[in-house]
C-alpha cells in the first residue's frame, strides 16, 4: 500500500443558509440568532437564552470530490440536533450542540466530475434547552478531511510526560492506528526516530506506545507556557501528524494544596461561558483567543469552561498564553433543569460526548481537571452516585492523568447528604458553599476542595479562604466575562424598576444578558476586577474607583450576583457638597488621598481592612490622586464630549475570511479623558477588505441588533468587530455621531 496524503482543509466558505423562509450566502462560523433583536414577546429561548428566536435552519454547500480513499467532514460544533446529508442521503447525525463529531461521507460521494451537495439540517426548535445563550447553527468550524484507509485514528496521538525533573523528562506517546479497509493491512509507525510495525485486521484499531527523553526540559506554566511538538509518521501517510504538548507536573493534597512543577500555586479562577459576546456564539479563533487574553489581563490563572466543552482554539490559546483550565462536559444530568436540556440525551449520548471532549482535549497542558457536571438537580438521590461513577468511568477510559471534579451546591441545610457523591470525585467542587470547608474538613480530612462558583462580591473572603487553608486549592468567580442569556444576573436596580433576581417568575425581560462578569462585553475591566487581581497578584499595586452614591440615579437595590455600582468616574454633577465614597485598593500599608492637590486624608491598609481604603468626602469636581508608597493613580472629572477615539486591537488583518479586529469606541473630552456617562448614538461604516460583524455596547438592556451598524455608547464606550475578506487590502472604519467623524485604518 503506497503512501497517501492525509489532509485537513477548512470547509467554512461558500454555504447557503435557509431560515424563516429566506436563503442567504454565509461563511462559517455562523449563528443565526445574533442577527435578530432580543425580543421578550417572541424570543423562544426565554430569559435563559436572552429572548432569541432559535428554530430550525438548513445549510447547503456544493463541492468537488477530493482525492483520497476516505473523505470525512469534521464539525467542531453545531447547535444543535444536526443531521448531515450528502447527495440526498443521510450520512450522519449528532445531538449535543457542544461536542465535535465526524461524518464519513465517502460512500455518498460522486465518483465522476459532478459536484456533490452537503446539507446540514439544524434543529434548535425544542425550547427551552439551555440555561444560557446557546446560539443556533454551525457556529464552530467545519473541516474536510481526506486519508488512506489505514491511518492514524482521529485524536489517535496521546502524549503524556513523566519522571519530570529539571534535568530530564520522559515523553510517552501512544499512537492509535485504524484500518477501515475490507482487508488486513500493515504499516510502520515512527515517533522521534523510533519505529514499530503494526498489523491490523479489517476494521481493527491498535495502539502502539513509544517513549523518549528530553534533556533539561523547559517546563510549561502560566508564567512560561513553553510548548514542544512531537511528529508522528505512518508509512501509509506521506505527511507527519504534529502534536503540541507541554512538560509539566502537578499534584494536590490537603497539606500542600495545588502544586505545579514543584511550586505551590493558588488558583484564581473564573467561570466563562462559550459565547463570544457581541458576535454571539460564532467561535472565530481570534474571538476565542481574545477571551483568554482578557482573562489573563484580569489576573486569572484558571478558567472553568462552564458548563460545556469549549473549542480547540480556546484551548490552544490557553496553552500558548498560559492559562489553566477545568474542562466541563455537562450542566445537568437525568433530571431536567429545562424541558429539552441534556436530560433528554444523557442515557444515549453521555459516553460519546465525554469521549469527544476528552479525546480531543487531553494533549492540552492547560487542562488540569475534567468536570462531569454542575449543580445536578437529582443530587440528593442515591442513584446520582451511580451516574457520577459512570461519567467518571467514561473520562478514565480516555485519560487517567487528570482528576475528575464536579460542581455541587445546596440551597438548604442538607449538605452532608452529598458525602457519598463527593467520594466519587478526586477534587470536590463547591458552588457558593465553601463556607462549609471547616466542618467538611473535620468530617473528611482527606477531601481536597475548590470553589467552582462564587459570588463576585465575596472576592476578599474567597481569596482569604484559599490563602489560609491548603485543602481549599482555588476559587472560581461567577463570572469572568459578561455573557448573553441568563438575563439580568449580576444586575442592580433602582427603585421603580422591575425588582427581584434574574430567576424570578417571568425572568427579567428588560435584559438579554448577564452583567456579573469582572469584564464587560466591550472588554472593559470593572473595578471589582482590579480589586480581585490586586488580592491574588503582585502586578496591580494601586487602583482607585468611586462608589455611585445611593440616590444619585435612584435608590439602589442589589441582587445575589451584583456588586455595588462602582466606576472609574469623578463626574457626579448635581452631587456637589454631598458625601461620596472613594475606594482605593492596594497592599501597601498606607494610602493618601488628595482632591485638587489638597490632602483629604491618610488611611492604614491591611488584611484587616481587606486591602481597601474607603474615603468619604464631599463631592467637588476636579482631580483625585491616590498615593501609596511609590505608586500614584489619578481620576479627573471629564469635560463635555468632544470626539470619538477609536482603538484597534491589531494593525493587520489576514486575508483569510477568518481574521477579526476589535475596535474600541470611546467618547472623550478635549483632553482625551473618557466621558463616563456619555450615551451617544453612533453609526459604523466599514470600507475596504473587511465586513462589519457587530457594533454594540456593554448595555445588556439595549435591544439594538448587535450585527447592525448602529449602537449607542454606554458609559462612554462601545465595541466594533470587523471580519476580513479573502482579498488583501486596507480597511477603513469610520464612526458617525453628533461628534466629528472618527476614522481608523487597518492594513
Indicate where each model-derived feature is located:
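Substrate-binding/catalytic cleft of secreted carbohydrate-active enzymes
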Residues: 174, 286-297, 301-536, 541, ...
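Active-site-adjacent substrate/metal-binding segments within catalytic domains
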Residues: 34-62, 69-86, 92-95, 145, ...
Amino acid at each position: 500500500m503506497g503512501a497517501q496524503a492525509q489532509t485537513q482543509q477548512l470547509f467554512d466558505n461558500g454555504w447557503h443558509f435557509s431560515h424563516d423562509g429566506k436563503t442567504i450566502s454565509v461563511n462559517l462560523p455562523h449563528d443565526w440568532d445574533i442577527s435578530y433583536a432580543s425580543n421578550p414577546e417572541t424570543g423562544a429561548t426565554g430569559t435563559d437564552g436572552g429572548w432569541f428566536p432559535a428554530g430550525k435552519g438548513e445549510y447547503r454547500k456544493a463541492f468537488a470530490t477530493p482525492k483520497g480513499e476516505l473523505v470525512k467532514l469534521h464539525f467542531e460544533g453545531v447547535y444543535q440536533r444536526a443531521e448531515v446529508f450528502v447527495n440526498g442521503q443521510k450520512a450522519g447525525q449528532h445531538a449535543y450542540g457542544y461536542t465535535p463529531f465526524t461524518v464519513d461521507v465517502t460512500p455518498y460521494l460522486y465518483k465522476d466530475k459532478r459536484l456533490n451537495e452537503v446539507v446540514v439540517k439544524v434543529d434548535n426548535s425544542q425550547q427551552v434547552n439551555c440555561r444560557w445563550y446557546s446560539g443556533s447553527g454551525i457556529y464552530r468550524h467545519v473541516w474536510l478531511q481526506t486519508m488512506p484507509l489505514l491511518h492514524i485514528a482521529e485524536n489517535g496521538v496521546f502524549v503524556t510526560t513523566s519522571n519530570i525533573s529539571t534535568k530530564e523528562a520522559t515523553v510517552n506517546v501512544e499512537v492509535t492506528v485504524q484500518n477501515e479497509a475490507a482487508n488486513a493491512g500493515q504499516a510502520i509507525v515512527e515517533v522521534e526516530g523510533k519505529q514499530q510495525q503494526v498489523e491490523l485486521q479489517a476494521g481493527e484499531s491498535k495502539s502502539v506506545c513509544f517513549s523518549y527523553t528530553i534533556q533539561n526540559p523547559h517546563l510549561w506554566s502560566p508564567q512560561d507556557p513553553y510548548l514542544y511538538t512531537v511528529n508522528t509518521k505512518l508509512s501509509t501517510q506521506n505527511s507527519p501528524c504534529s502534536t503540541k504538548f507541554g512538560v509539566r507536573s502537578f499534584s494536590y493534597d490537603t497539606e500542600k494544596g495545588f502544586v505545579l512543577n514543584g511550586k505551590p500555586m493558588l488558583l484564581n479562577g473564573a467561570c466563562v461561558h462559550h459565547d463570544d459576546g457581541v458576535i454571539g456564539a460564532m467561535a472565530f479563533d481570534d474571538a476565542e483567543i481574545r477571551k483568554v487574553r482578557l482573562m489573563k489581563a484580569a489576573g486569572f490563572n484558571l478558567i472553568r469552561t462552564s458548563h460545556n466543552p469549549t473549542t480547540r482554539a480556546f484551548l490552544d490559546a490557553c496553552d500558548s498564553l498560559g492559562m489553566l483550565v477545568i474542562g466541563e462536559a455537562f450542566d445537568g444530568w437525568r433530571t431536567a433543569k429545562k424541558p429539552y436540556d441534556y436530560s433528554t440525551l444523557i442515557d444515549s449520548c453521555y459516553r460519546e460526548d465525554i469521549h469527544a471532549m476528552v479525546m480531543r482535549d487531553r494533549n492540552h497542558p492547560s487542562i488540569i481537571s475534567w468536570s462531569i457536571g454542575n449543580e445536578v438537580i437529582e443530587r440528593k438521590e442515591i442513584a446520582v452516585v451511580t451516574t457520577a461513577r459512570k461519567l467518571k468511568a467514561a473520562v478514565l477510559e480516555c485519560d487517567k492523568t487528570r482528576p475528575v471534579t464536579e460542581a455541587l451546591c445546596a440551597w438548604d441545610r442538607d449538605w452532608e447528604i452529598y458525602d457519598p457523591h463527593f467520594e466519587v470525585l478526586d477534587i470536590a467542587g463547591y458552588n457558593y458553599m465553601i463556607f462549609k470547608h471547616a466542618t467538611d474538613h473535620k468530617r473528611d480530612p482527606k477531601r481536597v476542595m475548590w470553589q467552582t462558583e462564587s459570588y463576585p462580591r465575596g472576592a476578599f473572603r474567597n481569596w482569604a479562604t484559599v490563602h489560609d487553608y491548603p485543602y481549599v486549592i482555588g476559587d472560581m468567580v461567577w463570572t469572568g466575562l459578561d455573557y448573553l442569556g441568563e438575563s439580568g444576573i449580576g444586575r442592580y436596580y433602582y427603585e421603580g424598576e422591575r425588582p427581584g433576581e434574574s430567576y424570578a417568575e417571568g425572568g427579567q425581560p428588560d435584559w438579554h444578558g448577564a452583567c456579573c462578569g469582572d469584564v464587560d462585553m466591550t472588554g472593559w475591566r470593572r473595578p471589582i476586577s482590579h480589586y480581585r487581581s490586586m488580592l491574588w497578584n503582585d502586578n496591580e499595586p494601586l487602583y482607585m474607583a468611586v462608589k455611585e452614591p445611593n440616590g444619585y440615579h435612584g435608590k439602589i437595590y442589589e441582587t445575589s450576583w451584583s456588586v455595588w455600582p462602582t466606576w472609574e468616574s469623578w463626574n457626579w454633577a448635581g452631587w456637589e457638597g454631598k458625601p461620596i465614597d472613594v475606594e482605593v485598593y492596594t497592599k501597601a500599608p498606607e494610602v493618601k488621598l488628595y482632591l485638587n492637590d489638597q490632602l483629604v486624608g491618610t488611611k492604614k491598609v491591611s488584611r484587616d481592612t481587606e486591602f481597601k481604603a474607603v474615603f468619604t468626602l464631599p463631592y467637588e469636581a476636579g482631580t483625585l490622586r491616590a498615593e501609596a508608597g511609590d505608586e500614584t493613580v489619578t481620576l479627573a472629572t471629564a469635560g463635555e464630549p468632544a470626539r470619538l477615539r477609536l482603538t484597534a486591537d491589531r494593525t493587520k488583518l489576514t486575508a483569510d475570511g477568518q481574521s477579526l479586529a476589535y475596535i474600541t469606541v470611546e467618547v472623550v473630552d478635549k483632553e482625551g479623558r473618557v466621558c463616563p456617562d456619555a450615551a451617544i448614538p453612533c453609526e459604523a461604516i466599514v470600507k475596504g477588505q473587511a465586513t462589519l460583524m457587530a457594533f454594540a455596547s456593554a448595555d445588556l438592556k439595549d435591544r439594538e441588533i448587535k450585527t447592525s451598524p448602529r449602537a449607542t455608547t454606554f458609559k462612554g464606550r462601545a465595541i466594533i468587530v470587523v471580519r476580513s475578506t479573502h482579498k488583501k487590502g486596507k480597511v477603513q472604519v469610520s464612526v458617525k455621531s453628533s461628534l466629528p467623524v472618527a476614522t481608523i485604518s487597518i492594513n
